[in-house]
A protein has these predicted regions:
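Hydrophobic alpha-helical segments
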Residues: 1-147
Length: 147
């Protein structure tokens, strides 16, 4: 049960159902991001953010299509994984956008461009990072599982 008396479930969707417009907005945002960047990158960002925020208990729930062992390794130290240039750039940007978002500058986007990502992709990646930070922090605050 969440920390809200009116919410009996253990998932973020149960919590957001207390404010139906919030639930609808959350589903729409998540759907647009996943559609834009794909399930793998979306899940990698989610696992990365969970790990960076020290919410490892959410890694399994956020791993989506990722193999369990891959998600665990990603959460432990993604720099040791065999990743594409795009994935490395995305996870590096995820770190900066999660741990020190106020210091993100134009130069921090360059590795994403060098990896071949277009501005639309970069915008959606930034949205995914922000979304997962919101999702995980809200879930942790109310003791529910993110999605």
């Amino acid at each position: 049960m969440s920390r809200l008396r009116t919410v009996s479930g253990k998932r973020l969707e149960d919590l957001l159902a207390a404010a139906p417009d919030a639930l609808e907005a959350d589903r729409e945002m998540r759907g647009q991001i996943q559609k834009g960047i794909g399930a793998r990158w979306y899940a990698m960002i989610g696992v990365g953010v969970a790990s960076l925020l020290r919410c490892e208990r959410f890694v399994y729930d956020l791993r989506g299509p990722l193999e369990k062992s891959f998600a665990v390794q990603l959460a432990a130290d993604w720099t040791k994984l065999s990743l594409t240039d795009e994935e490395r750039a995305i996870l590096s940007y995820t770190e900066k956008g999660t741990l020190d978002e106020a210091s993100v500058r134009r130069r921090d986007v360059e590795p994403l461009r060098q990896a071949g990502l277009a501005d639309k992709d970069i915008l959606l990646i930034a949205a995914a990072i922000a979304y997962h930070n919101y999702l995980i922090r809200l879930a942790a605050a109310f003791d529910v599982m993110p999605s």
